[in-house]
């Protein structure tokens, strides 16, 4: 029996599955994700799933990991200090594509060199100047990024610069041409900088994951999921970590297609913190053709086109009472559900809730608690005296918000401590509402019911209670989540059809459709694609969401671990692109890493380009961990019609090699 171990680090939970291609999921387990150190959560999930299945280490032939580390690091601005060697560019180029913002004050070195669009040198590479500049900055950085003008047409200057830096410093170097074959030098440079910054972080995670495998005696290849859903060997991921951004969402799409057998669908994955909505087309994730955007920076990385909203089972529920008609606001902040907090602190939670229920009118901070985070890795550096004082009081132990804060100013300070990751709030959530309604019962239902009663007693602008008891309030919360989810799904569908715009789903006509209102004109928006719901709570909410958008709803078995399944059922897939140009009439040039070769006949040039692309894609697929890869090739040519004759301008030959990963080494 050969098993695969799939691991996914989500925003709230880290999932692990043991998977057999014939039997499906053999065992699954969850552990809380530890954002400050993902390894802790990974170890917990792996320990639990291996113990529950009682398997032998030798039975595990493949381990695959999807991780939020790269995405989170870029959003939070974390990573190593890097130097960018910018060859053939000028100051104006550095102002484009958010490059200066991405550098965050890290060294930027301008060096003469680069090529023209046909791959001919526009200036000699100034190696002497490069050697001097590298000597100055090397002691202050953890790596280098190198980007040269038109390196996608001729990368020789990037390669020469890389070799010099490695000889001189021994530090890792990322070259732009290795990450993307597309034009746009500044954005390719930005992608290279981000990649170089992530190398240390991803290398550390992979080494730790391999240590966990060794602890269990697992001797198997370790793969990492890319942002397009494909797999790559851990050794490749260490050098190209930027390609792991959005790997978790991509993995969920691969898992969704596998679990359902559906090749075209909208997929919505609801977790504790967020809901991710995307599309699968022909069994593969629909990719963002413009490159993935993370932390406000648009990269040149092919990754899943994903819409993410701060809406999950653990979203904070706030009742907005300033309007004549009160509304429920969900998220975007994640909090600890009352039903979960009561499991760890039953006396505190029930005593406080019971006391608050005796008070009338209800307080603004009813059903809200503060939990200190003592092992979150967050720093208290930079707090002012009042914030530091509030933090010290919070660190004493769990408390009600009402007891901790000493005035309105403290409420703002508490919010800042939460954003810094120093404390967490426990409050009423959709998870609590589901406990009250009996749809999901895993924790303390009594605490959830008391919290719902307190929330229902809040007063509207007219002075009346916002809901008639715990059940009515909980139904209101669940309906609000379902409505928000349906709006997000509709917006993704409309974007696919070319109708984009924030809040488009709240247009009066679409609102009428979602509310089921009809008159002389019957307005009914309907998804033509199936809607696949993923996540531990998808079965609770998504039958209703599918009904709202008039779609065929599908919630597969093991929807709660689809991401981890996607990590092991995916394929290795790599692309190799060879460019062709016509520098002058009758001379056709093949642009390749080793040399630029000219031909007098276009057909011969295409044959050579095809051969090179096939061989290179097979080699790279093998390095990425594929076994018995298959190759397909696409040609794309641009021509101009001049004087009644078609004139070849340029073209590409792209080979794609794909195969399942090799099993036990």
Language model features with spans:
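N-terminally biased helix-coil "hinge/interface" segments that flank
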Residues: 1-665
């Amino acid at each position: 029996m050969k098993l695969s171990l799939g691991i996914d680090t989500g925003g709230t939970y880290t999932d692990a599955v043991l998977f057999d291609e014939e039997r499906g999921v053999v065992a699954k387990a969850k552990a809380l994700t530890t954002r400050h150190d993902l390894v802790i959560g990974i170890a917990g999930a792996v320990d639990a799933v291996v113990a529950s299945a009682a398997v032998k280490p030798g039975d595990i032939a493949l381990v695959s990991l999807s991780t939020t580390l790269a995405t989170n690091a870029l959003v939070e601005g974390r990573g190593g200090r890097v130097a960018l060697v910018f060859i053939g560019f000028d100051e104006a180029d550095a102002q484009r594509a958010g490059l200066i913002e991405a550098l965050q004050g890290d060294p930027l070195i301008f060096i003469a060199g680069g090529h023209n669009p046909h791959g001919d040198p526009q200036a000699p590479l100034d190696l002497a100047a490069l050697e001097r500049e590298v000597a100055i900055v090397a002691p202050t950085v953890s790596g280098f990024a190198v980007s040269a003008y038109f390196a996608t047409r001729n990368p020789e200057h990037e390669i020469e610069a890389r070799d010099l830096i490695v000889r001189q410093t021994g530090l890792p170097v990322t070259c732009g041409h290795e990450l993307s074959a597309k034009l746009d030098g500044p954005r390719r440079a930005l992608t290279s900088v981000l990649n170089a910054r992530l190398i240390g972080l991803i290398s550390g995670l992979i080494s730790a994951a391999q240590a966990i495998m060794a602890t269990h005696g697992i001797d198997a290849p370790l793969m990492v999921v890319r942002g397009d859903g494909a797999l790559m060997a851990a050794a490749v991921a260490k050098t190209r970590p930027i390609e792991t951004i959005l790997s978790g969402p991509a993995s969920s799409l691969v898992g969704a297609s596998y679990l359902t057998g559906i090749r075209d669908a909208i997929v919505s994955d609801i977790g504790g913190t967020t809901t991710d909505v995307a599309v699968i087309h022909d069994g593969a994730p629909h990719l963002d053709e413009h490159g993935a955007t993370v932390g406000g920076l648009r990269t040149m990385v092919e990754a899943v086109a994903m819409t993410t909203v701060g809406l999950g089972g653990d979203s904070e529920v706030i009742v907005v009472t300033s309007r004549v008609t009160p509304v429920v606001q969900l998220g975007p902040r994640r909090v600890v559900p009352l039903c979960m907090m009561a499991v760890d602190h039953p006396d505190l939670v029930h005593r406080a809730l019971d006391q608050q229920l005796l008070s009338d009118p209800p307080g603004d901070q009813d059903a809200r608690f503060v939990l200190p985070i003592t092992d979150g890795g967050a720093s208290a550096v930079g707090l002012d005296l009042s914030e530091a004082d509030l933090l010290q009081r919070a660190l004493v132990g769990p408390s009600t918000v009402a007891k901790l804060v000493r005035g309105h100013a403290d409420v703002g300070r508490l919010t800042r401590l939460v954003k810094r990751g120093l404390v967490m709030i426990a409050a009423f959530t959709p998870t609590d509402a589901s406990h009250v309604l009996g749809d999901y019962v895993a924790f303390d239902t009594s605490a959830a019911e008391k919290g719902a009663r307190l929330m229902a007693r809040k007063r509207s602008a007219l002075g009346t209670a916002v809901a008639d008891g715990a059940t009515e309030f909980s139904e209101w919360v669940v309906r609000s989540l379902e409505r928000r989810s349906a709006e997000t799904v509709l917006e993704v569908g409309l974007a696919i059809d070319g109708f984009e715009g924030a809040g488009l789903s709240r247009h009066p006509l679409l609102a009428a459709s979602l509310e089921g209102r009809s008159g002389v004109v019957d307005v009914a928006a309907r998804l033509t694609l199936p809607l696949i719901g993923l996540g531990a709570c998808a079965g609770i909410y998504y039958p209703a969401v599918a009904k709202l958008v008039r779609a065929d709803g599908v919630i597969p078995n093991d929807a709660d671990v689809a991401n981890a399944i996607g990590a092991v059922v995916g394929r290795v897939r790599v692309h190799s692109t060879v460019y062709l140009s016509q520098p002058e009439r009758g001379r056709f040039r093949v642009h390749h890493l080793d040399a630029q070769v000219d031909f007098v006949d276009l057909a011969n040039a295409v044959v050579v380009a095809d051969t090179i692309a096939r061989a290179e894609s097979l080699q790279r697929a093998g390095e990425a961990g594929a076994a018995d890869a298959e190759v397909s090739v696409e040609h794309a040519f641009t021509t101009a019609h001049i004087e009644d004759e078609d004139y070849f301008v340029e073209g590409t030959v792209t080979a794609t090699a794909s195969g399942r990963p090799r099993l036990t080494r």
